[in-house]
Amino acid sequence: MDEIFQYIKGKTILVTGGGGSIGSELCRQIAGHEPKQLIIFDIYENNAYDIEQELRRKYKNLNLVVLIGSVRDSRRINMVFEKYKPEIVYHAAAHKHVPLMEKSPNESIKNNVIGTYKTAYAALKHGASRFILISTDKAVNPTNIMGASKRLCEMVIQSMDAVSKAGRMDVLPLLHAHMDKYFEDQIPGDRTTAAMKNQTEERSSVHIESVKNKDRQGTQFVAVRFGNVLGSNGSVIPLFKKQIEAGGPVTVTHPDIVRYFMTIPEAVSLVLQAGTYAWGGEIFVLDMGEPVKIDSLARNLIKLSDLMIFTGKGFHNANTIQILLNNRIQTVI
């Protein structure tokens, strides 16, 4: 679309989590809109390497930078913003697998919530014009840790936008990682003093950065929320296919749960479009058509595989759809 082309063309774009299923498609579509520079930031080197090779083959003149690092690392993130000065940030880095996050809730909070805060903080400090958070429909009245963490991410983004509009970045809390450079030469007894000194100096530098960027309109923070994307990492369909190939069971958390689905290119195209419309503070909800019951989806996938269904009660109160394969019920021992 012309409006997306004009929005992206000639700008420096940062995509965190750029090697993931959503992040890599963002990079593909952004690369086709002639950015001044595209920066891919990801902690997983194999994913980052794969998308780098693909883009370099397809877009010979693309100014592409691929960086390895974590959004949980304040100093690394700050260095990226300080060196490359991205104008638009797409924040796709996140832990997305619901069952894994139930077992490791602290990691979900650290990577999703704290990682979002640190990246948004750097974007505001260094004068990025727009920050787009990739969120999920699981953030609506969340029933799991991952969904709750993404809802907190949305709240962080809306708070950041309010701070940006007020020009009061100095009121933002400083995290421990913003201070640790002052601890390197301190003995343990001096750490409290060092931390207090750093808080004062950091707030002073933040105020100076805010004054420097007064001529800008401030960073606009928005979130884009969508449902399950077909074929993406963490999506339920690849999981169901693997469970079916293994002979079952196919597990559904609850028979009444519904989800929305669209393809990865469709979802990313709408994310880019939402970014062009943003004024700051919005949570865009993509129109993904009619909701689909996960239970019905699982049953239809089993039927498409020419298998029969047996339904029973599984572990952890999950509704387990078992497959009748070669006249024997395939079940978990």
Provide a role label for each language-model segment.
Residues 76, 118-122, 261:
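Conserved mid-core alpha-helix of short-chain dehydrogenase/reductase
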Residues 162-192, 197-198, 202, 206-217, ...:
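Short mixed-charge
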Residues 67-68, 110, 254:
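Conserved residues in the N-terminal Rossmann fold of short-chain dehydrogenase/reductase
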